[in-house]
């Protein structure tokens, strides 16, 4: 199998890269990012390209007939600086990458979204995530897998702000306890393992594309079986 990873320097994307690197099922792994990920190996082809507008052409060339494409790419409104920039980054880059992956003949598209994603939401973050989900499904990959994790735990290379850091600091102590339902906290490494496992599962190609959602509570239950 072969895989392309978008967002390989982020919390979940980096963990996906690590899982793929250690997997015996995946023989070839590629990624593109503004800076090189911290994981390196002979299996991984990491492409450093600061200009994200050039990523689709790279993806269409490098991901030709790949088994799977994983996107854990994203930002926050605070980091983006404005609502328009947030949409341009979180939706625009992801969607253009997905179109390139479809043109390249990728079989399975795996999107790491978020709990509560809904294109009709009044909250910008959830609205953008929901619209991205809908539009990627509309591309009709043979199979689309969407994960909607709750609060993501783990060490980030870049901070998402004091409030986020404080909430994560509290919720990590609820992880795996009966109070897990409060935010459904889950480690990025666990989401990554579930994502890669899901992409490895066989499926029957039919007239209609396969679409599979993994909701936050389901993810927190699945990690217990890893």
Swiss-Prot record:
<keyword id="KW-0809">Transit peptide</keyword>
<keyword id="KW-0472">Membrane</keyword>
<protein>
    <recommendedName>
        <fullName>Protein FMP52-1, mitochondrial</fullName>
    </recommendedName>
</protein>
<dbReference type="Pfam" id="PF08732">
    <property type="entry name" value="HIM1"/>
</dbReference>
<comment type="similarity">
    <text>Belongs to the FMP52 family.</text>
</comment>
<keyword id="KW-1000">Mitochondrion outer membrane</keyword>
<dbReference type="InterPro" id="IPR036291">
    <property type="entry name" value="NAD(P)-bd_dom_sf"/>
</dbReference>
<dbReference type="GO" id="GO:0051170">
    <property type="term" value="P:import into nucleus"/>
</dbReference>
<dbReference type="GO" id="GO:0005741">
    <property type="term" value="C:mitochondrial outer membrane"/>
</dbReference>
<feature type="transit peptide" description="Mitochondrion">
    <location>
        <begin position="1"/>
        <end position="43"/>
    </location>
</feature>
<keyword id="KW-0496">Mitochondrion</keyword>
<dbReference type="InterPro" id="IPR014843">
    <property type="entry name" value="Him1/Fmp52"/>
</dbReference>
